[in-house]
Amino acid sequence: NLSNKKMPFLLYPYIEDEFQLSDTNRYKKEVFEVERITDVNYAKVDGFWLSIPDDTIDIANVVKNNWFNYLKKKELNLDMDIYLPKNDTLTQRPLMMFIHGGAFFVGDKATVPYQKWCNHFASLGYVCVSINYRMGFRPNQKAIERTAYQATQDAHAAMRYLVSKQDIYRIDTDNLFVGGASAGSITAMN
């Protein structure tokens, strides 16, 4: 019975060279205006759908209006919005990629919270990206699991695309960060 025993342990802090700042406000304060590039295609895939903005969701209507989409997958263009700090002189900047939530069923890269997050981080000096990914699933456990796996594949494809375009967007590939909400956070952890 371990419930009454004290278990000593030691934490070893992860030590990394300090993040080098070119000026004292970068990454701390909003110092840049932001350029937004919308609907950058990063892949083509087969799936049910990509985007149902979740700011006015009525799940019953989503199911009713999209049930024909469950019959057959179609080719979809995976897109992302890219937010860049304007007039930034650094040749390499850290990247933050956000993945929206919505239970792998609804959501969109351009909903207000993701626009605000991306604008904020780009104004600090990061390259920031919000992606769309395949959504929708037939009502069975295997299909739901497959949808989560496909979202992960799509996020990996987005990151591969960004790394391949690192010179264009001036991305520091040693500093790549991924986050999300709900289904997006599940995807980000994979």
What function would you assign to each model-found segment?
Residues 92-95, 124-128, 173-175:
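Loop/turn elements at helix/coil->beta-strand transitions in domains of secreted/extracellular proteins
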Residues 103, 135-137:
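Alpha/beta-hydrolase active-site loop signature
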Residues 110-130:
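Short amphipathic alpha-helix adjacent to the substrate-entry channel of hydrolases
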Residues 145-167:
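Alpha/beta-hydrolase active-site loop
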Residues 160-190:
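Primarily recognizes the serine-hydrolase "nucleophile elbow" in alpha/beta-hydrolase
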